[in-house]
Structures are given as C-alpha cells and as structure tokens.
Amino acid sequence: MEGKIALELRNVTFSYPSSPEPVLKNVNLKIHQGEFLGIVARTGSGKSTLLSLLAGVIPHHFQGDLEGEVLLYGEETRTLSLAKFGVHTGMVMQDPDSQLFNLLVKDEIVWGLENRGVAREEMARRLDEVMHFFNLDDFKERITYDLSGGEKQRVVLASVYISKPSILLLDNPTSQLDPLGAEYVIQSIKQVLETDETVIMVEDKIDELLGHANRLVLLHEGQILLDCGPEEFVTNRELLELVGITPPEIFDLSTRLRTSGFALSAMPTTLEEALPAYKLLLNGRAGVGVERSSPPMSERTMQATSPRLAGSSGDLAVAVRDLNFVYPPPKQIHALKNVNLEFERGLFAAIIGQNGSGKTTLARCIAGYLRPTSGGVIVGGRDVNAIDIYERARRVGYVFQNPETQLFRGSVYDEVLFTLRYQGIKGQEAEERVRHILEFLDLWDLAHLHPFRLSVGNKQRLAIACIAVLRPDALIIDEPTTGQDPAHAWAIMTLLQELRDQFGITVIVITHAMTLAANFCDRVIALCQGEVLLDAPPREVFAQREKLAETFVKPPSVTQLALELGIHPPPLNVDEAEAIFKERFQI
C-alpha cells in the first residue's frame, strides 16, 4: 500500500542502559497511512521496544543508546514533545494494568479527553460511542481493578481509541481476550481502518493477523528478516520454523496434505479459506485416490496421534463443594453459582470461558485467596480457608494473571530462591532447584537481571518458576501463556506436564489458548456466567460447538474445520487431522 508515510525508521539501532547488546539492529521500515501492519516475533525479539520507538515512548520516557532516525510524518521524533505524539498516536500496551489510572471505567475512558480540555457534551457523546463500539455498554460504573484481564484490555483499547489518533499501536491487544472477544477486537480494528487510520499490531501468533493485516514483518533478534504480504509471508515456512514461529494450523495441515499428494484446489491459511477447498476434497472432486468406507478416524490412529496424557491417580487433591461467591458492594456480582468440581491428584485440567465468566474467581477460591459466600473448597482433606498461610503455600500454588503482582526481589535468581528460603529449603538443594527451573524456562541467561527489566512474557515465566519450584500438591496458573509466543507457550505447558508427571502435582490452568488445552489437558471445564457448562475430556468438550458458543470460546482451527465437514470425533491437532485424510483416501 502506497501513500503518505506515517512512520519511518532509518538505520535504527537501540540498546538499553542495562545491556550493551542492541535490542534493535539497523532496522529500516516505512509505514504508510491507512495501512494495517502486523509485526510477528517471538518473545524477547525486540517487538515491544520497536513499538515503543514508534510511539515515542523511546527516547522520551525510556532512555538508551539510539542511533539512526525515527520519523513521524517526516519529523524526527527526538525533536517532538510527547504531547505532539499524543495527538497522532495511541498505544495499547501488553499489560493493561500499566495503563489504568482511574477508579471507574467511564472516568478511565474519558481521562485523555479531559486532559485535552474537550467539552463535556462532546466527551459524553464520544464515551457512548466507544462504549458501544467495544461492547462495554454495561461497564460505565464498574470499578477498573475489579475487571478481568480481558475486560481491562477492552477498556484500555476504548480509552486510547476515544481520542481518535491517526496511528494506533497495539502490543498483543488480544492476549487476554477469549477467542470470540479477540475476533471482535480485530473486527473493530478493521472498522478503524475504514477511517484511513494506521494500525500497527505486534503479535506472536500469525493466526491473529492473517486475513486482516495487509502487510507482515518478521522481527528476529532485533532484525527484520521478512517484510511482505500475508500470502508470501506464510510460504516462507522454512525461515519461520528456523526462528521458532509456528505456522497457522490450517496452512500446516494443507502443506502436509499437498506433500502427501492431495490436490487441494488452494493453499488456505484461514478456516474461511479452507472450507471450500476441503469440501471439494471430501466430495471427491479433487484429491488423489478413492475414498475409503472406514470411519473418519480409527481407534488405532486416535491413540497414535492423540496427546499423551498421563491422567490422574484417582486420589482426590481438590474438591469444590456447592461453591457460591458474591462480590461485595458496589460490585455485588454473583460470580460463582453452586459450583461442584473434583480434581484428582495428577490431573491436568483447563478452565475456559469468556472474560468475566468466573474463571479467576474460582481459581482464587481454590487457592484460598477469596472466602466463599457459601460452600467451600477442600484441599488435602481440609478446608482451604482453615489452613495457615505457610501450609497453604505448600499445598496450593497460585500464579496471578498479572505476573508483576508477584515479583519484588532484586534479580531473577533471588526471586526464585526467596520462595524456597521462605519454606526453609536452603543450600545445594535450593540452588539446584533454582537452576533447573530457570534453565527449563529459558531464563538462566537472565538470572542476573531485575525482574522488572524483563519482557511481559519473561515475567510470566518467572512468576511460574517462583511457584513451580516449590512443587505444591496443586498448581493453579491464571493465563500461563499470556505474552508468550507459541514456542514458549508450548515449553511452559510441557514444564507443567513434567511437574505433573514427576511429582504428581495437580495442574489447573485458566486459559484462552484452546490449542494448548486440547493438546495438554486431561479435562476441560467450561464456565458460563458463573456456572459449570461443560466438564469432560477435551475432544468431547470441543465437539459441542453450540454449547461452547455460549462461553464465547471456539475450538482449535483444525477441530472447527473437521466439525464443519461433519467429521466425528474431531481431531484436536494437525497430526490427527492429517491422519484422518490419510485414512479416508488411499494414495
């Protein structure tokens, strides 16, 4: 897309004072007005730093060694004030809590307008407009710190968009949203583009950008390796895999099938593109060989391709009995309604549902941080609220959705070590445990850094390390993969699986990552408006699309594709989907 250049980087290299190694290296980039540019990168590749440069946060707020030029509508950004930046740019950061300042949602959203002296009548009009635009009509009087992570993210989006910036910079804006909520935000962003605004969106998952962005940039270790259209981007499969970027499931499946000899009519990257091509294939109008009369997926194939789930021991680790929780005034929301659940020792469970469905409230009740209005939680045969805080920490570990609430030591190493010393574990055992957990989570090289110098993704991994190092009976993680690229997300879930397998820990994750829930979890519990809607193995849960729609959750892409094609039971991953087609057609 050609036209007026909104932002430009010329030979930009940048390093922070705490690290001599440049985070960005000789970056050259032109962004045109009205363009939707997607920046794809793994955790720690410099994407948030790049966005901060484009927004003027660097060098006006964060200092460092900056070489080269950053131009906003042709003006060197070093010479511009932050106030002038604010007229043209609006930035949504990865952590919504870092952008919330006011008590009430309505005050938060109009705060920027108040600072600019916008008339009260105009503020009221714009407030109503953006509240409706971001599906926040009932949130005006809500308290910001009582919102779920996804709700906070939408409020921050609204507070930035209300000022009508010509350039919108988004750092993983859907990371804490349920799948349908994320899709709604993307559609809202596309509406923004109709007014000729520029959107620059950082993402570590290509799927979120395909079909929406008109240009994609691959950033790796501070350098731009690819800058092209979406179709050309995904065809660079070898390069993407080399730098650890996971291809979209639909594209991965289609590539495998073509390699096996299937004559797909197209190489789709999204579900919408895939359906026509795969319907032709299944109807016998394309493809190779003769369709077999066997079932879509044999028991043998299912066992060979399914995720290897160790399962539980049968001993009860956590029991939730007739649990009700009502938040006190002014919120006064009945967040949990007669919830009954049992978690066996060694179980790996996922709690899913739309933002505000009660997932985090349930997790905090299980951990003993919230006292139920009625009913209770039994951990190790005892009421969790009757256990003293030291024993509770040994029995139930909890990792918050915002990792910064759990980080307070001077270095990454000391942060993890403190947890062990607090429980009386010292000496060589403590040192070995710290090194093992940091190496496994790819944090050992950062052990000397202050936790607040880490990226959001690395902070999340550090918070998990601090709790997992204790090896509690039950480990609850609220959105363990927030801010993680797919490779690191997979590594975190693998670590949790390893902890479960080695020590019999019951693992409970709250997640919007359906692919991870499908591949790692023994059980999936879907909440809807504070009630348990579904509670079954992943394949059974994800096959019930109508009920899942009530929770604003969508199954993994290949599962959706199979269900649309009438394939039952549906596959949970690309390996299973590939096996289905190889069973249905003889080559």
Language-model regions, residue ranges each:
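Conserved ABC ATPase "signature" C-loop
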Residues: E221-G222, G530
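Helix-to-loop junction immediately C-terminal to a conserved catalytic motif
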Residues: A55, A367
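Conserved ABC ATPase signature
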Residues: I143-L147, E151, H450-L454, N458
